[in-house]
Amino acid sequence: YVFHDYEKGLEHAKKENLPVMIDFTGWACVNCRKMEEQVWSDNEVKEILKNEIVIVSLYVDERTKLSEENQYETTLAGKPKKVRTVGDKWMVLQANLYGTNSQPYYVFIDHSGNQLIESANYQDYGTVDKFKDWLIRGLNEFNNI
């Protein structure tokens, strides 16, 4: 299951009793595409992603405008930031919750939004073996709750 909305993905995960992998990504993210093409395409990784978790892919550069009532102002890295687009919303979420704004960035969470294991990125988890191990550890942690 792949969702592009944090709340909807979390709701579905609760209903299906599956963990969530947040995938902070971007349309213009070269390493995101490399990860998808070289790592997610592996048969074992693909099976886990498809059947055992809910993926919430949040595009931090999505330009779709938020409705007026959903736009707001916040602080990002100590500076005022107007949140006007879907991408702005996800960028602020990533920065505020996880202290980073690089992509790809993967976070394994439970139904309450608690992080289950360390987060993953392309630099440290950009191989099939490392990413698969990370997924399995996340699943094991979720199943031990």
Role assignments for model-derived ranges:
Residues 1-22, 26-145:
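Proteins that catalyze or organize thiol-disulfide redox chemistry
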